């Protein structure tokens, strides 16, 4: 069973299709691993054992009947971030205000996973409403990094990344608002991709910041991530921001990249995303990765994106502004937690009491910042200025891609930091998003692929690869080439 759960998803899918292993056997092995290890990691908030085994049995039945499998990943189980709605499991978004809530509908992404024959093992832990960089803001307790139990796994989707690193699941889904897929991937030596905004449906993704949120695939290899990306991407009429366009051949790009030939590929190193404030071991790993890309034949040059210096400030005005609007729906009137509804309090008092008890400190902080930024006296000075910076950041990237095909940077400024180190220092926590959030502001795509272990502390480091909107295939070509040249890494457990 140990060899089975440590296999990559592509290998497992091939074994299922060849009837060398059953989907039920694999799903049960993953459930057994969760049961044996999750008291240490707390990657999951809810386990859907019955539902997952039923989905796996359906794949086995179809195979036995000689039917064609619904996808290349049919029967390979997955961990789903608890921000996507599911009719058969609770959706809490890591918040007390939604404790025990069950959605009356599946997210479009959830439906696509089910249609592909992918068993959903359960819902993974996350920072409350995807607000955080460490998964310490969950109302249900923090997730621990399998590489070091005293360190964070990143956030907001630390549960999905930890589940992969702990071999609890071969596939996972996250959401990325400012780096919530890529940053945990970097800290756990897994692969995470933020697809182009609008290419993966947001219908049923509980909103944090609607113009920034994007669901995406996570796995332990670039090819596995590409295969999952192919399953979840595509136009959805239920999402008004969904792009009605052809999705790039990400699987083909990953397979082509595995040959290790990057001749003719132009790679830009972002000047603003390295230097002071970065951990020496992270920079050393990044420089080694750039040297490896050069050795594979890529043409590497430095690229200047001057407005990246203002990205953090712009992001932390735009995101809270959208949060303050989106989270107004949690009013204790329709669903979720309700405090003080005993006939002695007005509706306004019930709402205030419920929100005070149901939201955690970081969520309240961002609601307050957003309400202030959107207020009549400060809208132009803060929110409008932030949107102007957002436009300039997108222009920086558009200009950069005139001379290069992809950009690269460290995925995070440091390796995983100790639990509790930044939880009471919001500014330090926000700075951890420095490398990843510019892509969300621009709507472009990005990947974090493991680039080794830091010589400083032996913890994982991630290489971030960035590409223009609708050029997601470039991520997979470069990522797969680098992964093949880098070779295997030690495992967390």
UniProtKB/Swiss-Prot annotation:
Keyword Protein biosynthesis found: yes
Coiled-coil positions: none
Enzyme Commission code(s) on record: 6.3.5.7
Biological processes annotated in GO: translation
Pfam families cross-referenced by the UniProt entry: Amidase
Cellular-component GO terms for this entry: glutamyl-tRNA(Gln) amidotransferase complex
Active site: 81 (charge relay system), 156 (charge relay system), 180 (acyl-ester intermediate)
Single GO MF descriptor: glutaminyl-tRNA synthase (glutamine-hydrolyzing) activity
Self-association and partners: Heterotrimer of A, B and C subunits.
HAMAP family: GatA
Family designation: Belongs to the amidase family. GatA subfamily.
Protein name according to UniProt: Glutamyl-tRNA(Gln) amidotransferase subunit A
Organism expressing this protein natively: Mycobacterium ulcerans (strain Agy99)
Organismal lineage: Bacteria, Bacillati, Actinomycetota, Actinomycetes, Mycobacteriales
Gene from which this protein is expressed: gatA
């Amino acid at each position: 069973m140990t060899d089975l759960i440590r296999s990559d998803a592509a290998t497992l899918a091939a074994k299922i299709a060849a009837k060398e292993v059953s989907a039920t056997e694999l799903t049960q092995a993953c459930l057994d691993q969760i049961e044996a290890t999750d008291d240490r990691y707390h990657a999951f908030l809810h386990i859907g054992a019955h539902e997952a085994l039923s989905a796996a049995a359906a794949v086995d039945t179809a195979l036995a009947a000689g039917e064609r499998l619904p996808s290349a990943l049919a029967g390979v189980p997955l961990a789903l971030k608890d921000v996507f709605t599911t009719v058969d499991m609770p959706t809490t978004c890591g918040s007390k205000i939604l404790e025990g809530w069950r959605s009356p509908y599946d997210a479009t992404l959830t439906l696509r996973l089910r249609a592909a024959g992918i068993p959903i093992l359960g819902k993974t832990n996350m920072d409350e409403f995807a607000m955080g960089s460490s998964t310490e803001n969950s109302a249900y307790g923090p997730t621990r990094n399998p590489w070091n139990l005293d360190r964070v796994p990143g956030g907001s989707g630390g549960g999905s990344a930890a589940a992969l690193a702990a071999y609890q699941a071969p596939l996972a889904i996250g959401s990325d608002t400012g780096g919530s897929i890529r940053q945990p991937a970097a800290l756990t030596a897994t692969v995470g991709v933020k697809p182009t905004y609008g290419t993966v449906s947001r219908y049923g993704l509980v909103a944090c910041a609607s113009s920034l949120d994007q669901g995406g695939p996570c796995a332990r290899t670039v090819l596995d991530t590409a295969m999952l990306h192919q399953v979840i991407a595509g136009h959805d009429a239920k999402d008004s921001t969904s792009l009605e366009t052809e999705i790039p051949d990400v699987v083909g790009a990953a397979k082509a990249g595995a040959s290790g030939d990057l001749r003719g590929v132009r790679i830009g190193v972002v000047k603003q995303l390295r230097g002071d404030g970065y951990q020496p071991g992270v920079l050393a790993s990044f420089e080694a990765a750039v040297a490896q890309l050069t050795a594979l034949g890529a043409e590497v040059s430095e690229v200047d994106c001057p407005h990246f210096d203002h990205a953090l400030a712009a992001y932390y005005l735009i995101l809270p502004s959208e949060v303050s609007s989106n989270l107004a729906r949690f009013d204790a009137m329709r669903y979720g937690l309700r405090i003080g509804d005993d006939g002695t309090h007005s509706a306004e008092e019930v709402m205030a009491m419920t929100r005070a008890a149901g939201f955690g400190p970081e969520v309240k902080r961002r609601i307050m910042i957003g309400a202030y930024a959107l207020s009549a006296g400060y809208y132009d000075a803060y929110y409008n200025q932030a949107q102007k910076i957002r436009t300039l950041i997108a222009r920086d990237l558009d200009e950069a891609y005139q001379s290069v095909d992809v950009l690269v940077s460290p995925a995070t400024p440091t390796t995983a930091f100790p639990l509790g180190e930044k939880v009471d220092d919001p500014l330090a926590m926000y700075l951890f998003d420095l490398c990843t959030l510019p892509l969300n502001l621009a709507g472009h795509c990005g990947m974090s692929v493991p680039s080794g272990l830091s010589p400083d502390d032996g913890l994982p480091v991630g290489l971030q690869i960035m590409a223009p909107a609708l050029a997601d295939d470039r991520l997979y070509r470069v990522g797969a080439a680098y992964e093949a040249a880098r070779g295997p890494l030690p495992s967390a457990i």
